[in-house]
């Protein structure tokens, strides 16, 4: 028998749920669900808008992953990328196969074109937003909180850009959110499988697994010690039995699927050899001081070292003289300022709120932030690991949740909430990649 998960724990505390209400999705009865559908539709339309532009250009790391997919499919590819790679096998051994395989599958169906490259990212970006809304609604029992958090996430630039380019990160995030939602729904073993799929897209999915493990133990501890059931003993044998089952499903499914994909599409006969290669490759990615687009993790909280993914400049001439240059397209790896500059204060407030009233969703926000972001600090300080700002993508939803809690917990006038939402839209518009109609 499985433990109740986020949903059951929230009900046990009597704070995060209103007698089971708000768990479903019914736009006909819940106006917040209806408003979310509008936000979702706008987000989807913006991801699809000019998806094939700029023509003939690969954006940022698409140079690698699109060409990897071409190699997997046996198609002609850029000779600068894995020039000696045998066709039919994934030459990009530093990451697991799954996300690259999904890109290749899309290209097999839709063709070697921008729609084939990017449609899976559009799907997973949209899926991530929908799962995030359902997750927040389920763990908090509050549709207004879920709507505001989803609005903030939808109009974050980093989330938007990675939800429409053929890179691995949004696949990892999508499966991670699926794992969180399944856990919150009480389907724990399916949650472990989803988090294994997240890790098989990119190793950062491991942080999502850590979030669930730590949350499960801490929430049981607080329910027993401070959630209205003072004196209740913690059932440690049951907790460790749950940990054993959850970990076995996560590890076994991950290793078995890795072995299958490695044998069919990568060229490894032993998944542990592949895991050893990934470990050695990652360990070697070091530099004493960051260079170029590399950055320290603490710089991400200030949106520093933004990454120019792709810029198309327009030159203006007058009488054969260059008088002005401006970007017509500028894809940038950076967060919406209205999100990132509130990250630290909102997470601190969420931690304070949990200390005060033990709401489960505030604990999740804090752990989500801490376990997907803070591990980069020792990696940077002690290991001199090379890092990039877009590693923060897994943490962006946690910040959106924390900001929404910070705002709504003050019970401000609606005009204040509206003003913040307008400011988020202004920040999104300011960073929107297409500066003019292509």
Task: List the model feature ranges, each with a label.
Residues 115, 119-140, 178, 345-353:
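Transmembrane-helix motifs of polytopic, lipid-linked glycan transferases
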